[in-house]
């Protein structure tokens, strides 16, 4: 970490990015480090290819996150946050790979070890936990804005302290963030508080799509673009829906197949899908995701794939027989 701290303090212009379809950890880590570098008068750009979900737009500094990579900016350093591989940042990956020094900050067990400098801790509950430690080493003050970003990252990646990755650091750091001004009830209200009627209707369609493997150990939920159109919702409205499939009695692995693209391909043509996997702790879904070119954690992982929907479902149900 000392080498990374020294390098950041000597950097002229830093590019910071997190993974597409960002969650609270990806956004919180990005903002916390970006705001801290700003305190050091280090010029930086915050990037995420995807729209920021509405539930995270309350975070201080979120308006500074851009979806456009400035190829003329002459960055000397890139910090890639919460990404198992560089390609997880999306279309800008090839251009970003040309930045002289790439720093990889992550907690995923499937991290490829990309970059010139790595700060990877798979025992951390979240990337926000690692960013907290990095900020401490940078010796910049943690004000309420930075504290809110760190708290949100830890809260969401531990499932409100319910997931198996919840560790003692999650509680001690969040305790400190509260003492620095974070109001837990306010953050919870923004992140979990209210659902639109469209999201409720989308949940109804998603629940109706659930299929169970013959051995009862795997549940599969489908979310199509047509469902989004019918309910006037966005992909971000599906956040957390997979947990309903995971709570079914005897289910060890829950799968959500989410259609990407415009959803207008003929049924007999391959489509593009994002597949999310969740485990009850008895199955390593990161290994399953890795077999499809993806990654993640033992209990939460995912991958992108171009395939026929029927064939994809068959492959997934075949896996269920090995559970």
For each feature predicted by the language model, list its residue ranges:
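Glycine-rich, phosphate-binding/catalytic loops in enzymes
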Residues: 32-34, 95-98, 120-121, 172
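Short glycine-rich anion-binding loops that position phosphate/pyrophosphate groups of nucleotides
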Residues: 20-22, 83-86, 108-110, 225-226, ...
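Generic enzyme active-site microenvironment
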Residues: 17, 21, 80, 104-105, ...
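Hydrophobic helix-and-loop "lid/oligomerization" segment in the mid-to-C-terminal part
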Residues: 2-20, 28-57, 72-75, 156-292, ...
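Short alpha-helices
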Residues: 105-173
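A generic local secondary-structure boundary/capping motif
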Residues: 67-69, 91-94, 118-121, 139-141, ...
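Short glycine/serine/threonine-rich phosphate/pyrophosphate-binding segments
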Residues: 24-30, 86-90
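Active-site cofactor/cluster-binding pocket
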Residues: 60-62, 68-117
């Amino acid at each position: 970490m000392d080498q990374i701290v020294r390098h950041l303090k000597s950097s002229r212009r830093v590019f910071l990015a997190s993974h597409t379809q960002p969650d609270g950890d990806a956004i919180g880590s990005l903002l916390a480090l970006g705001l801290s570098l700003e305190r050091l008068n280090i010029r930086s750009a915050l990037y995420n290819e995807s729209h920021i979900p509405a539930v995270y737009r309350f975070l201080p500094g979120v308006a500074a996150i851009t979806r456009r990579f400035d190829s003329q900016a002459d960055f000397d350093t890139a910090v890639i946050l919460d990404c198992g591989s560089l390609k997880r940042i999306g279309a800008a990956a090839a251009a970003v790979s040309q930045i002289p020094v790439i720093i990889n900050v992550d907690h995923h067990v499937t991290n490829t070890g990309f970059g010139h400098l790595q700060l990877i801790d798979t025992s951390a509950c979240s990337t926000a936990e690692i960013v907290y430690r990095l900020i401490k080493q940078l010796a910049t003050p943690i004000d309420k804005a930075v504290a809110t970003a760190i708290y949100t990252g830890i809260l969401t990646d531990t499932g409100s302290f319910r997931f198996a990755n919840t560790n003692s650091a999650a509680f001690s750091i969040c305790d400190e963030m509260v003492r620095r001004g974070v109001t837990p009830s306010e953050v919870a209200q923004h992140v979990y508080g209210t659902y639109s009627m469209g999201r409720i209707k989308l949940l109804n369609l998603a629940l109706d799509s659930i299929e169970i493997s013959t051995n009862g150990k795997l549940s599969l939920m489908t979310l199509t673009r047509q469902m989004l159109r019918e309910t006037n919702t966005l992909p971000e409205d599906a956040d957390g829906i997979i947990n309903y499939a995971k709570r079914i009695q005897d289910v060890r692995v829950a799968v959500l197949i989410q259609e990407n693209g415009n959803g207008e391909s003929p049924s007999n043509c391959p489509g593009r899908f994002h597949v999310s996997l969740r485990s009850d702790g008895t199955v390593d879904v990161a290994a399953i995701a890795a077999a499809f070119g993806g990654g993640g954690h033992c209990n939460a992982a995912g991958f992108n794939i171009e395939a026929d929907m029927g064939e994809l479902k068959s492959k997934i149900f075949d896996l269920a027989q090995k559970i």
